[in-house]
Each structure stands twice: as structure tokens, then as C-alpha cells.
Amino acid sequence: MSIAIVYSRAQVGIEAPAVTVEVHLSNGLPSLSIVGLPETAVKESKDRVRSAILNSRFEFPLRRITVNLAPADLPKEGGRFDLPIALGILAASGQINVQRLPAYEFFGELALTGELRPIRAVLPAALTARDHGRALVTPLANAAEAALVEDLEVLPAPHLLAVCAHLNDSDPLPRYRAERSDGTQPEAADMAEVKGQEHAKRAMEVAATGGHNLLMIGPPGTGKSMLAARLPGILPPMSEQEALETAAIASISGNDFDPASWRRRRFRAPHHTASAIALVGGGSDPRPGEISLAHNGVLFLDELPEFDRRVLETLREPLESGVVTISRAARQASFPARFQLVAAMNPCPCGHLGDGSDRCRCTAEQVQRYRRRVSGPFLDRIDLQIEVPALPRAELLNRQPPAEDSNAIRQRVIAARAIQLERAGKANAHINHKERDRHCRLADSEQRLLERAMQRLNLSARGLHRILKVARSIADLAASPDIDAEHLTEAISLRRLDIRKP
């Protein structure tokens, strides 16, 4: 047979669309051409494939070879198609058995020696391959990642020869079997290590319960960064679907993805000099940015006013929708971005306003200019806005009874989050307007209290709705079916900070 078909998959956003590798051998001058809108890296695979076939002691056909990567309108990039192209050439030239090819999907970059090198974005391809009932043949280094998908036969191969021997039934590839780590190793950072700041710790607990965004403002050294780093340790565990989605994004980014920690919530803390592309994602071949890498986890923005204002404004839509869409001239890609934002900032340019040291010499105009670097619409999307004051030296030096550890807080958060999932199927921060009206009803007295707070604090409609969601989370922590005045008052106190006023 002078034609062969091999199955593989491309990568577009978080999706893995099917790619059919068609190889045809015909009479004519010896040549190898690849068609089907391949990128430069795919075109370069011609030389890699030829050398790999020859160094694996197969014959490279001295015929006119046409390789079509279908569908033709789907951009293909990277060396992931090296293995299926090589197998297609060997099958079309009759050197390997073609009967078993339809049962598998193949991925892998070939070294000149025929060894298989790892590729990125294997996990999205593995998820889709399972749904289509095919086994997966991958490089050995990608096996643990692909094996995260249950009910999928993963066959890791170290070399092109091993794949060919498997297809010829002479030496079957062993199925990869690995214990699926739950990824729930104890967090090194414990909330008990933070001295004092009980009000801030309570805000962290409420934020973790409902998935709310949080802004902390206070002088340097008050524990803002410590508190933020401990938020993942009190968040409830991810579901299997959430964990796989998060792991798939890490797989696409290719930044040292560790299958052993696939269930751990991510904590991302980009520097304030990060560009919009670094934060949101982009590039000619769209890659996920920090907000997608923090999907189902925590995105910590320290020194918030130091970020470029235009960069911060790009976060407004993902904060609402939980998705970021990157559009380029040739393609469009969407990545999930349902992250929990935690931001921290100083109260003034020098940072010492209100710390009791009398070191601050900033004028009121300088303070206002500093705080106005963060726009009102962006602040409106942050549910909790609290002050983290400097602690008295005596409180820092005195021995105090052990503070509550992260595990104790986490158990309360898990119980409250279970109430939310049973009620609405999602965290309180993500409920829509209809669900909010249904689940956040107030009695007349609480309604009047909220109206007074709205007038006094000059709240927008979005700010009002976010207070209701926070109050619902506080009520869930108390296992209360109704929002009472105490819950509403605490929710208002967690948002009453006006960072515009020095």
C-alpha cells in the first residue's frame, strides 16, 4: 500500500483538535513535502524524520512523498507530529503493519537517532483521546502526565524502533501504570506562623470560603505577603475535573509541569513589571499567562499600584467571566482563568503612613495620586478590602498562645463550601444575578441596614452585590440558612475601606 493514515492531535488553546496525518508515496523524483498549513517547526521535521528513520535502520523510500496534515485550515506547530509522520512513511512503504494504526494516537518529537523527546500539551490530547476510545503512544517522559487521565491506555516508548516493534507485534509496549498521587502534600506555609492580624485572618477565611477576591493595604512588614502565601493552604481541595483542567493549562505552558502535584492549587505571584502578555497570555502562538496558570488557584499581585495601569485593566473581563480569549490574525485561543485575586499595597508612596513611626512625609496629594493608580472599576471587582495595620512591638515580642493553624481553618472552609456547592453548584463569588437574588434574600431590617451602608460608603451596584455575596459566605461559615444583621455587618466591615482617602 502506498498510502497510510496516522492519528494525532494539535493544540489550540486548551483544546486538542484531531489531526489526520496522511502519507502518500508516488512515482517521481525523490522528495518529501509537508502540506496542511504547517509552521516552520513542522517543516523542519522533514530532516529529523529522515535521519531518525535511517538511524533506526529502516529504509527511507526513494520516492515522491507527500505528507498532508488535515484539516488544512488548522495551524500546526512544534515537533509533536514527528512520530506520526515517520510511522506514516514506514507504513506507506510497507515496513510496518498498518492494521493496528487506527487504534492509537501518536505524539512525539524525534531526535536524529530515533529517540523520542517529550512535547508539551500532552494532557489535553490525552483527555480527548480517551473520549474517542483510542490508546495513546507517547514519549517516555510524557507518560506520567498522560496517565493522570483515568481509563486511558498509555503506551510510553523510548525510541522509534520500540513503536515499530509494537505495531509489528514483535515486542509489545508495556502499558504505563503509576499510582495517581493525590497531590495533597501538606503545605509548608501555615497560618499559625502569622502573629496577630486576627481581622486579616478572618478576611482570608471568608475569602477562601466563597472564592472572593481580596485587597490588603498596610505598611511594609505587617504580614500581607505571608497571609497571601497561606491562602492556598486553607482552600478546599479541587475536584477531579478542576484538577485536570488546571494540570492541562500547566501542561500547555510547558513550565516544568510536575504530575506529582497535579491536585495542588497553584499560587502565582508575578512581579509588578510584568507585561500584559505575561499576565493575560498571548504571543503569535497563544500561550497561557499568569491568570490562566493561576486557574482554580491564587493570583497574588504585590505592590498593586506599581503595576502598569493598562496591565491591570486587562484583568477586568477575566475577573468577571473566568475566561480569557486571545485573538491573533491567524487564530484565536481561549484559556480558563477562574483565579482568586489577592492584592497588596502600601498606604502611601513611602509605605509608612499610619504605622505610628512618624516617618511618613508624603503629602495628601502624593498619597491620593499613588492610590489613584488603581482604577475604580478594577477595585469594584475586589470583594474584600481590608487594612492590615502595623502591630505594636510589644505584641510581636511577647509570647502568645499558639495561633490557629491552617488545617483547622481549612476544615471550616470545606464545610461552608460544601453548603454552597449543594445549594448552587458553585462558590458564592461566582453566582449570577438570579442566583444571588434567590440565595441572598434579606429581611426588612437587614435591607434597611444595607441601604444605609450603600449611601454612607457610596457603593456602586456591583459593590452592593459583592457585599451580599460576602455576607452569604459568612452565613455559610456559621451554617446559617439566612443572612442576619451580624453577617451583613461583618461583610460591610470587610469592604468599608476607602483606599482613595488617605
Predicted regions and their residues:
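Peripheral, non-AAA+ core regions of ATP-driven protein-machinery
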Residues: M1-L215, P219-M226, S327, G463-L464, ...
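Basic, amphipathic alpha-helical bundle interface domains used for macromolecular binding and assembly
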Residues: V35-K46, E59-P61, N68-G78, D285-P286, ...
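Short loop/turn elements that form and flank the Walker-type P-loop nucleotide-binding site
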Residues: F60-R63, R100-L101, D131, E150, ...
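Residues immediately C-terminal
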Residues: L112, L299-F300, E306-F307, R393
